Amino acid sequence: MRLSWTIAFGVLTAWAVVGQAAGHRFATQGENRLAIVGADGSVEREMPWGGIHDIHRLPNGHFMVQRGTAEIVEIEPENGQVVWSYDSGKQGGNEGRPVEVHSFQPLPDGGVMIAESGPGRIIEIDRDGKIQKTIPLKVAHPHPHTDTRLVRKLDDGHYLVCHEGDGTVREYDGAGNVVWEYDIPMFGKPAAEGHGPEAFGNKCFAAVRLENGNTLISTGNGHRVIEVTPAKEIVWTLEQNDLPGITLAWVTTLEVLPNGNYVIGNCHAGPENPTLVEVEPKTKKVVWQFDGHAEFGNSMSNSLLLDVAGVRR
């Protein structure tokens, strides 16, 4: 895909290929820039942009990303122009209410699913901004900043929701009933304030339903990734210090590749740790990492692989 955003001629040195694995081309945000990073680690294109918690690429090559606290926009990549937008802070009956959007998803029918924190609901809208469906969310500790993190509509029409403030992943059916939920354990440790490796909690960020029916969960400030069965048994875990020379901090995005590997976001981890890590789950071998702190800072919370088809995320 050819982009005509500002061309960045500087080449990053902050990337690594471990063993024989190739690097990845991906989109990300950090240091007030939305950027595409090449497989060689160079910034191919960039544009000024604030923080994000979610990003998608549409079949037409456009990007869908959040702008500000509550607006979702579609960006035409040839010139970086916004060609469509929906503002949950002003539309859908939300004007005057505290609203934050941390997750959304383009749907196969052309509509968009949006998780609205504050109102505590999932909405599906058409491209005219008309609400087609509303799913109320169960939130034990409501707050517009923490009601949700990543939310995904599954192939069966259910919704898999990370409730950051509750420390719980809930699955809702198409009628809004909770059909499964999993409380992220504290593993016998006390909560600790902060965002980096020294913090601790259960503020889940992402959940991916695997082909085997299990759920892969990034536990945010729990510094780990866990695989949980429908019966709520943990059958696999990647802990904070399992990867040699790498410390996991606020574990964010999860991308499950067709080859079975996991690409994991490692936010707030400091300059001594990579911001993205690709891991073989069976061996816990690191096959690729991106050390993006110098270029994108300590708050690179979301990324999107652009060079691999069929990724679950």
Give the predicted meaning of each segment.
Residues 4-16:
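Bacterial N-terminal signal peptides
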Residues 20-313:
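Histidine-/acidic-rich catalytic cores in large beta-rich domains
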